[in-house]
Amino acid sequence: MRVGCCLLLKPIRQRLCTASISSRHIMRWCATSSSNINSTETAAKMPDDDVSGSLSAPSLLKYKIEPSTATMGAPRPPHDDDRAFCTLASFPPSHIRNFAVVAHVDHGKTTLSDAILRRTGVLSGSQVGTYTDRLLVERERGITIKAQTCSIFVVRDGEEFLLNLIDTPGHVDFQYEVSRSLSASDAALLLVDAAQGIEAQTMAHFHMALDRGLTILPVLTKMDAVLSDAPVDRALQDLEDSTGLLRREVLFTSAKEQVGIEALLHAIIERVPPPTGLLGLSDLQQLPPLLPGSAERAAMEEKMVPLRALLFDSWTSECGGGLRRPAPRGGEKVNSGNDNDSNLICLVRIIDGTLTAKTVVTFYQSQRRCEALEVGIIHPELRPTAALTAGMVGYVVFSRVRGEEFFVGETLYTLPTRKFAREDIVPVPGFRRVQPVVFAGFYPDEGEYITQLREAVEKLRVNEPAVTMEPLDCPALGSGLQLGFLGMLHMQVFQERLLAEFGQRVLVTPPLVQYKYREAGSDEEEPLKPLTVHTWKWIHEGAACYLEPYVTATIITRREHFQAIDSEALRRFRGEQLDMRVLDDARVLVRYKMPLADLARGFFAVVKSLSHGYASLDYGDPVYEEADLVKVDVLVQKSRISALSVICPRSEAPSIGKRIVSSLKSNLTRTAVDIPLQAMVGSKIVARETVKAYRKDVTAKIHAGDISRKQKKWNDQKKGKERMARRTVGAVTLDQSILAAAMGAISL
């Protein structure tokens, strides 16, 4: 649940991290990057007045990290030895750490994740770019869209630890990715840009982790970018005031300079709690022939814990974002038999038990049974292993499973053993499906078939579980699909992935939010009915009232930009200011009550433009309120074009209708007859334009004589055009380019 307005709550004064760590280990900023996590040497402590090192600003030396006295050795097994992974033994839960990296947009999550992977030897120094951004659209846009995980092996004081890192998106449209990642984690690294401080999504992620009872490790990032102590002090104060996290708990890092990474890894091992799972032999159906009541039999029964795992992501080889099994070395040809593009790859967190290849697992909701073809970890590509045990995060490969037979958030389990019955299997709690807030029609490009588009969408939905799909049929555009998304950016990214990964060019109708209505004579307790342009009901047709979704939008911006943003919110986007709070000398927090339709229409883009990119926005779940809504229909030569119908407030119907018919007039080709363009609300015309016909000068050869000769020619021409118009009713063809231009006018 989005909780951007939670900044107004009183500070939560409590110690969120149960494990303690030396304050001098946390609060001292080290301006050197000389030590490496694979080295047994630690960096020497720098004096407070020393200004040497890779960071140029001497004022940063107020915040230093003194390296831990614990030492870290080389990771094992080596990341380039495939045989070591195939024989990977189970890790005890006490030596496993699962954590997610969460933060506001562009606060350094992916850069820090890559720095951790490079410091631990998972990535080599020769590899460039952000490794966890695998999708083409992620690299083009420069943002994280899909959460990515990677297993890291670290040896500390002779003990080997398995760290499972999950890098998450920061944009509000991808909160579902963050929610799933936190459900599979035991802790969250809460990153805050040292220069920008607390932002709206920072608080949303903080409360999301807090609601799940996760340990929170606050981390200030981009320490190399600040030029004085003032922004760091302000960020620390914001953390204390807004979250209750103590200053001495804060870690300082510079992923760009590879500084503070080793101290961060030490803190993860010391402060992140190990998973609480039971090891077991999940696929064991019969006990060995041991004497009843013997200690050996009792010990074996204790190990017979059935498998219980959380499925928190899935993909196929066709839409896996470049995640593949590493190529064999030395020209070896390896064929595991599990490389079929139609196979389903699921990312799972093992709660209890053990998962091995050939284990038959059951999906809790659908009761579908499937055999695991392969299990393994991501390090950083797919690495098959002998087993996944309690507390581990890895992948499992199934033969092709249809999308309706499972959903992300599903609990996987094995058949009951002698000790555990079916009713003892409890689904993994704390995970819920989200409802889409923006809907749009997707139609295949001219010359393409709906079957190919439907297959591409179904394959991509395996990796995008928040997208909903329903069939559509439009006389002007043909067969299509109505898809539901979590926001405008989510819709744009999905459209780009269809083109990049499946080559599908589509025409997208204007996005609409989910309106609802209450039937006449129904009780207040009865559920509301969904309202779309295809299921529209007027009041005289049985609708008692219409309801529109409203959200509470929280904006954090600089004080000099507040007036411009406030003016636009109230004037163009039907916003109602709820409250405003001054955070510090430079920033303010303001909350608006606003229709979700106006928010999706481009409010965030306007806020970013007016604030020069320095504002952040978050909004919560929609709440439905009664509204005066109408449906605007567009008629071209008296034929209704359903693709251009739109639901809007009654007060905005004339302006929206005017924009649509004006766009059609400027793009339609003139013909031999007039083409009337009308926008109607019910039976009332609210806007009209006419595409004038070509007119032949029938009096060109008449140079003299009475005027009645010209009038006769004009009357004959008029009668002929009337006969032609009667024969060509509905014959106007609208190309997709014309419809796309008219649809764009709706969103202005």
Curated annotation (Swiss-Prot):
Main EC class the enzyme belongs to: hydrolase
Positions of the tr-type G domain: 94-276
Pfam families associated with the record: EFG_C (PF00679), GTP_EFTU (PF00009), LepA_C (PF06421)
InterPro entries noted in UniProt: EF-4, EFG_III/V, EFG_V-like, LepA_C_sf, LepA_CTD, LepA_IV, P-loop_NTPase, Small_GTP-bd
Positions that bind GTP: 103-110, 167-171, 221-224
Main location, first listed in the record: mitochondrion
Its EC number(s): 3.6.5.-
GO MF: GTP binding; GTPase activity; mitochondrial ribosome binding
Keywords associated with the record: GTP-binding, Hydrolase, Membrane, Mitochondrion, Mitochondrion inner membrane, Nucleotide-binding, Protein biosynthesis, Transit peptide
Catalytic activity, as annotated: GTP + H2O = GDP + phosphate + H(+)
Annotated transit peptide: 1-29
GO CC aspect terms: mitochondrial inner membrane; mitochondrial matrix
Gene Ontology process terms (BP): positive regulation of translation; translation
Superkingdom per UniProt: Eukaryota
Its membrane topology: Peripheral membrane protein
Cell compartment(s), UniProt: Mitochondrion inner membrane
HAMAP family per UniProt: LepA (MF_00071)
Similarity-based family: Belongs to the TRAFAC class translation factor GTPase superfamily. Classic translation factor GTPase family. LepA subfamily.
Matches recorded under PANTHER family: TRANSLATION FACTOR GUF1, MITOCHONDRIAL (PTHR43512:SF7), TRANSLATION FACTOR GUF1-RELATED (PTHR43512)
Database matches in NCBIfam families: small_GTP
Cited function: Promotes mitochondrial protein synthesis. May act as a fidelity factor of the translation reaction, by catalyzing a one-codon backward translocation of tRNAs on improperly translocated ribosomes. Binds to mitochondrial ribosomes in a GTP-dependent manner.
Name of the molecule in the record: Translation factor GUF1 homolog 1, mitochondrial
Species annotation: Trypanosoma cruzi (strain CL Brener)
